[in-house]
Structures are given as structure tokens and as C-alpha cells.
Amino acid sequence: MDCQNGRRANRTVRFARTAESRYPERYSYEYDPEETLSRAAPSMRNAPTIPPPTASGADEMRYTASRPASPARPWSPTRAADWVRPPSAAASYYERADINGSPRPGTPSSRYGGSPRRPLPPAPLFSKPGTTTQDTKIDIGDGEEDPFGGGGRTISSRHGPQGSVQSFTSESTFIADETDLEKVDLDEYEEESNETKSMVDPNLHYGPAPEKQSRRGVRNAQMAKKEVQLVNGELILECKIPTILHSFLPRRDDREFTHMRYTAVTCDPDDFTQRGYKLRQQIGRTMRETELFICITMYNEDETHFTRTMHGVMQNISHFCSRSKSRTWGKDGWKKIVVCIISDGRKKVHPRTLNALAALGVYQEGIAKNVVNQKQVNAHVYEYTTQVSLDSDLKFKGAEKGIVPCQVIFCLKEHNQKKLNSHRWFFNAFGRALQPNICILLDVGTRPEPTALYHLWKAFDQDSNVAGAAGEIKASKGKNMLGLLNPLVASQNFEYKMSNILDKPLESVFGYITVLPGALSAYRFFALQNDAEGNGPLNQYFKGETLHGKDADVFTANMYLAEDRILCWELVAKREERWVLRFVKSAVGETDVPDSIPEFISQRRRWLNGAFFAAVYSIVNVKQLWKTDHSLARKILLQIESVYQLLQLIFTYFGLANFYLAFFFIAGSLTDEKIDPFGHNMGKYIFIVLRYACVLVMCLQFIFSMGNRPQGAKKLYLSSMIVYSIVMAYTAFCTLYLIVLELMAKTGHDVPITMSDTLFVNIVVSLLSTVGLYFFTSFMYLDPWHMFTSSAQYFALLPSYICTLQCYAFCNTHDVTWGTKGDNTINTDLGTARIINGSIVEVEMPSEQLDIDSGYDAALRNLRDRLEVPDPGVSESQQQEDYYRAVRTYMVSVWMVANVVLAMAVSEVYGVGSSGTNVYLAIILWSVAVLAIIRAIGSTAYAVLYLIQKLVEGKAKFQAGNIASANASAAGSSLGTKSNVSYGSKGLNMTDRINETKWAISRGMQKAMFWKK
């Protein structure tokens, strides 16, 4: 019967088309404006009214008990075939997983204009089994409750009344008989006649092209004007989260899980608390103390970088909650942690990053406003406690993967005002409101290991004098370590490793780490606060944001390119305090490093200039250390560190000359025909060619650096780096060849000529103190694999680090920008054309002929009188730029002349063949050895202290385990039960001892497996 009904309906439609095309005068319809349509009016005029179908025309409407708010549309035959099988009544309510079981973006309900053939999204992997959708139903506010909160009422709708809820019963959907026919576009059918084609108006305009492809089951959000009560004159909204997100949340017992809070902030971050703004952690049932405040700053990074960092933070929060025996943390430890995500510029944020935030429930489109109560909005603050996480593969992770709730604050700044301003929002606005104990700073793209944040927090918990802590930054080597095939990535991997093995431990022993990396660092919030007069670390830290005009001299501007170094110095040198900085090697974070030459040079320009000027600042102000409350021993150590930094600064400044002189004396030793390894005096010719090539590239380097950006001169910089690598390789070959000759002579072999004992000792000591100590300390820290995979690339690019990077940095000291920020000011001095109605605008213009004539007369009078036009002068910004460039020129000239004079003087005093009596070469080699030995001593001291600390902690845990075991045994004896089998007399049962042994073995294997590092 259903098949016959379907064929009859299709024949009816075909008959209607044929009849209408042949007899158009019989088929004229009148439009009834009182008729209620469930959809938008069709583009064709005189649309017919079609009564509802009979029982034979379509199946009766069926409602599903489990989805009362999403009824399915009735099935009806299509025009493409005689008969189509209707959908099965037992069809599943869940479709296949999109990627990993994550919910589809569409709303599969006819209530929202969705497709009737689109089933419901799949059940998430972490949804509770056995629960139905009735348990997760929430009211979306059909006139009863406003989803935006505040009890506002709808004023008007942009789209007018909508009837999509009743679309499945609309009278305009079905055909009752042959007299009530649907008017259709006849161009869609092949059987239409030429007469029918002539009915179509060729000039008919269908409107503009759609901006994007329409998706089945997805409808655009429909906006409506509402009245919302302002809170203290500010806009604060409580918005319901999406229904599909709410449906699979494990916890829905509090408003922080079911509503997202939006606040439009119209003040400066320094006035956030004074203006009465409050966060969720300060109001109502969510009023809590904040122990850990995590800041994630981002600019325009995509969703992959964001989810990598955010998922790592969520894993760390889960680790905090897993420490059930901790006095601070435990099952509800997430309530003491707040994650603050700050995006620098609403126009700069990546759209897919906003999509990732929306998937977590933190962000909703269409809520933010530019102006509130005639005040411009400076930041949009979204607050939500999310219970799901997205990993870097965009797969949802929930409670089944150990993810716990996370309190998130998303601050979307209206304008791009650089990273320093983002930190001002974090510390001065949200930090003052929450008053946290510890603040952790992260950059988007850095993936902290699951226990990294706990180890950072533990450093503050164990020592009350710690004001800041730095984690170990590890370079990302790509999948299967394929990134090491890129020499840039490999050299940076070696540099990061040796810095974490030699430099950071040494500075940690002294108590002053020159820089806490913004990618992974932590601060004690109390230590950062200013004094009563407003002077202190934060005041100095944020001074770089407000430098303008005469105050922004080149030295200060470049110094604040590395403002985190200034903050570290101000903490250690804080008056009448005894704060120290620590390096936490167990807090590891992985970050991406530049893999292209332009990106690499641009990054190091800011690092080198900031580090150089910040080091000068700390050395000049070293006397501030004597006004602190440090012990005498600590003050002496800090003075020694200042001397060490001064030596490093001198070597950095004369790096060009020292590199050239080392090549000149070592490679020049092979110009003697007696020890020429190539014969025919080839050693001399090779030395001459490489010498002039090296000098030529150094000269060209200044032209490249002053006249070209790295992005526009990639091949030039690549060529110079290749030449430097060849020079370095030949110098290394000459060094090894001379050492082999000397060793052969000392063992009795007949060699034509030997080095002097002094030169031999100098070279050997220098090599052993660098390469030898690199191997020794790497094996001491059980992390030697970078010596085999990345050391060759690093030493090959070492001249480029010294020459190319340093030259580009000094030649661009006038560039003190972090990025580009355009001028977004709109000038209104000419007036505006205000739209009145449609294409009619209101403008100001001369209204009478007399006004036009007076303007003409004024022009003629000015020509006759020859009035002098006042000179506008040079703008302040142009004066500042000229000043920066002039100082840059003086600075580069002095630096270049100093290096050239040093190289020429030493090379003239000591010739090529006088290496044995070369005092300057001996000073250079022994200075390198002394500095390397100091670093090795500091690294060894840090390792010893770290080992002692772990032994003390292990002993304390062991004793606590003995006490707990004794108490358990006593309790078991009193109850007449037998306790666990003990292992020896140590108080540990067999199971605990086996578990501890397994853990120790596993930990050792993880450290030994280089492919996981």
C-alpha cells in the first residue's frame, strides 16, 4: 500500500508540472498574507497554499520519548525516483564518530532548522553508560528563562517570527490533490518544454553569493535584542553552555559547570579591582582561595599549539588532584588552581583557537560588545569551569582519561598591546583580585610534562625564600627525532641542553638566575609586590610598556626587550629582602624552536639585545645587593657571579675579533711547508682564500644587517652561514692535525716539525675544558645523547652564532618592537556621511551659492597675499626614530672599530708562525678553559645538592612509611587480624618494596632512552 501511495504521489507531481507549463492561465494563485509559514517566504511570487497530507501520502508523525525536544520530520517520497525506501523506525540516534567520538557541530533537530535525515551526534567516549538524554535535558529558555541571565526580555528579532518548531506540520510541505499544486522551478527538469523556459525572467537577480557553504544540520545563530540589567554600570552576563556540551558533562551540580560568565571590562588593568570587578572565585558558592595561578599568553597561534599547551596544563592539574596524601592538594585540588588565558588582540587571535575554546565551553560567539554604557571595552573576560580537554590531535579527553575540572579565565584583549601588557592584565588585574600564592607563566606552544607544574610549585613550598623558579626548556625534535636532520634545530637542541646542564645549575647555586624563561617559569606573588611608595619588581617590570618620547632611550628600550631579566634582577636585589631564584630541572617543558633562518635570526635579535643591555644594567647596579637582607656568604656569591657575567659580556663584545684571531693563528700554522698535510704548499693557499673569504663575509654582514630583513634576504644569510661553517670545519681540522703531530712526536715518531709545549698545552687544555667537560657533565646528569646527535651541528654553526646573530642584533638596536601594530585611529576632521535611510546619507556641505563664492574669494586672496604656511615640524615619533637610528650608528661604529683594531693589532704583533709565543692566544684559550671549569663546578655542586635533597626526601618518606606500617600492624593486632607479610625488618611489606623497585627501574630506563627525550 505504501509503495502504491508513493507512486501515486510522484505521478501527481509530474502531472502538475506538465499542466502548469501548458495552461499557465489556469494556475494563478493569490498570496494570503495571513497565512502562517514555518519557513521563509519562497523567492517565487504567488506561492500556493498546500493542505496537509492524507494518511496515504506520508507516514504519521512519530515522537520519540527519549528526545521530546527533537521530533523527526515525516518521510515523504522524493521527486528523483518512483519510490524510495522510508527510514527504518529502529534507526540509531547516534551517527558514526566524527574523528574520535567527538560531538558533531550541527544541531540535528528540526526545531533548529536541521535536516530530518541527520541523526543525533554520537555518544561521547566519556559519557556515563546507562544514562538517557532525558537526564541531561536543560531548558534553553523559550521565553521562560533568558539563557543570558539577568531576567532580560526580548525587544525585537532581526528575522521576525520563526516557525521552525512547527515545520514538520506545516501546511506548505505536502500535496493533497491535483488542484492544490506546488509551484516549482521548471529549469530543474529535463522534460520541460521551450515554452516553459521562456517563462523564466533572464534578468532575475538571485542576490549576492553566499559567504560560505551551507552545511546540513547547521543553522546560523539568530540574534535578538534583549534588555539586560547592568551590574554597577558594567555588562556581566551568565550564559548557558551549549546543550550538546552539557549533555555529556559528568558534573552539573553547580552553575560554574552549566553557565559561562562574560564580563566586558572597560577600565585599565591597574584599575580592575578598584572599579569593583570581581571574578567567580570571589563571589557566591565558588568563592575560593587560589594557591596556583597559571598564565597562558598567546598572540596568533593556531589550535594545535594552543591545545598542546592547554592539554598539558589539564594533565598537570590531574596530577595535583591525584596526590591524595598531600596537605595542600587532593581530590578537590582543582579548586585551588585557576588557568588564565590571555590573547593579545581580538583581531589577531586565530579563529580555530577560538573554536577550540568554544569546544571547551569557555568561549561563545556573539556575546562580546565593543561599547558598554558609552565606555569602550578594553578586554572581554570569559569564565567557565570546563570538564573536558582537547589534545593536540583535537580529540576530546574527559573523566575517563583522568581529566578533572579546570577553572578557566579567558581574557580576550580588544587591541594588540604586546605581551608585556598581557602580563599586566595577569598580575595587576586578575592577580590582585585572586591574591594567589604562586604564579606560573607559560607561552602557547610549550607543552609541560604531566608533573612539571607540581615540581615548580614544590620548589616554593620547600623554601620560603624562593621568589622565582625556572623550568627546563626542551627543544621539540619532531616525530621520530626527524627534526634533528635540520642543522638549525639540532644546534638549538644542543644549546638548550648544555644551558640546562651548565648555565642554569651554576646560576641556581649562586641564587640569581639571569633569566626565568617566559615559556615555563614561576613566581611568588607576594615577592613581586611593590612597596608603599609604588617601587618594586612589578613597577620596574611594567615600566617598559609606558616608555615614550625622551624617556625611551635606546639603552632602556633594548633592555626592556628582555624585561623578564629585569624582573629577575629586581627580585634578587629587592631592598631589605632575601629572595633567591632556583632552577628546577625536574620541571620539563617542550617547545618548538625556529626551523628557518629568518625566524631564527629575528628571535635571537631580541634575545641578544635584551640580554646584553640587561647584563649591563645588573652590573652597573650591583651595589644594590648590599642593601638587601641576604647573608654575607650569599652576597659574596652574588658578587662573584657579577664578575663572571662581566667576563662573559667582554667576550661577547669582542666575539668577532676573537673568532678571527683563533682562525688566523691555528689555521695559519699549516702554512709551513714542513707540516703541510696537502703538499705543494696547498695549506698556504687554502688559508689565504679562507682568510679573505672570512673578512669579506664579515664586511658584507653589516650591509645585510642594516639594509635587509632576514625574511627578504634568506639566501644571503644562508650563504654567509655556509662560509662560516667551512671556516670552522677547516679550523677544527687544523687543530686536530697539530695535536696528532705533537702526540706522534712525543711517542718517538719522526715528524718534520712540532709545536712548542706551551701551545700544545694551551690547545689541549682548551679542548678538554670545553668538549671534555660537555661529555663529563652530560653523563653526570644521565643525559648524554645530544652529544652524539647534535654537537657536530652546533660546532659547525658556532661562528654564525658569534658573527651573524651578534652583528644583526647590534645593527638593529633601533628596532625595539616585538611585532607590528598598525594605526587603528579613525580621523573625523572631515566629517562623516551618516546613513539616514537606505542609500540616503546626511552630509555637511555649502548650501548657498554665497558660501561657494566666499570659498573661492578666500583662495584668490591667499594667492595674492602669499601667506606663509607654518612648518609642521618633525613629529615626535619621527624624532624618536631618528634618535634611535643615530645611536645605532654610533654604537655599531664603535663596536666594529673596536673589533677591527683588536684583530689588526694582535695579528701584526704576532705573525702566522709565532703561535708558540703568542700571549694573546694563550689568554683566549685559558680564559675559555677557566669559564668552562667554573660552569662545570657549579653544575657539579647543583647535582650534589640535588642528590642530597632527594636522599633527605626519600628518608623522610621512608620513615613516614615505617610509622604508617607500624600503626597499621598495631591496629591489625588489636583486631585479631594478620597484617601484610613484611619484607625483612624495614617495615615495608612485600608489595610496596616490589612497586618501589619497579618504579626505580622504570625511571632509570626512561632517563637512558634518548628517543623519548
Curated annotation (Swiss-Prot):
Cellular-component GO terms for this entry: cell periphery; cell septum; cellular bud neck; plasma membrane
Its EC number(s): 2.4.1.16
Annotated glycan sites: 10, 194, 316, 837, 967, 980, 989, 995
Induction: Expressed specifically during asexual differentiation but not during either vegetative growth or sexual differentiation. Expression is stimulated by osmostress.
Phenotypic consequence of gene deletion: Does not affect hyphal growth. Leads to a remarkable decrease in the efficiency of conidia formation. Exhibits growth defects on media supplemented with sodium dodecyl sulfate (SDS), high concentration of salts, chitin-binding dyes, or chitin synthase competitive inhibitors, when chsC is also deleted.
Subcellular location(s) of the protein: Cell membrane; Cell septum
Gene Ontology MF terms in the entry: chitin synthase activity
Enzyme class, spelled out: transferase
InterPro entries: Chitin_synth, Chitin_synth_fun, Chitin_synth_N, Nucleotide-diphossugar_trans
GO biological process, one term: cell wall organization
Membrane topology: Multi-pass membrane protein
Domain of life: Eukaryota
TM helices/strands, residue ranges: 646-666, 686-706, 721-741, 759-779, 792-811, 892-912, 919-939
Composition bias type Low complexity, residue spans: 64-81
Main localization (coarse): membrane
Keyword terms: Cell membrane, Cell wall biogenesis/degradation, Glycoprotein, Glycosyltransferase, Membrane, Transferase, Transmembrane, Transmembrane helix
Pfam families named among the record's database cross-references: Chitin_synth_1, Chitin_synth_1N
UniProt region (Disordered), positions on chain: 26-83, 95-218
Reaction equation(s) it catalyzes: [(1->4)-N-acetyl-beta-D-glucosaminyl](n) + UDP-N-acetyl-alpha-D-glucosamine = [(1->4)-N-acetyl-beta-D-glucosaminyl](n+1) + UDP + H(+)
Tissue distribution of the protein: Mainly expressed in the metulae, phialides, and conidia.
Residue spans of biased composition, Polar residues class: 154-173
Family indicated by similarity: Belongs to the chitin synthase family. Class II subfamily.
Biological role: Polymerizes chitin, a structural polymer of the cell wall and septum, by transferring the sugar moiety of UDP-GlcNAc to the non-reducing end of the growing chitin polymer. Seems not to be involved in hyphal growth, but, with chsC, chsA shares critical functions in hyphal wall integrity and differentiation. ChsA and chsC share also overlapping roles in septum formation. Invoved in the production of the asexual spores (conidia) that are formed by differentiated aerial hyphae called conidiophores.
The protein's name: Chitin synthase A
Organism from which the protein derives: Emericella nidulans (strain FGSC A4 / ATCC 38163 / CBS 112.46 / NRRL 194 / M139) (Aspergillus nidulans)
Protein's gene: chsA
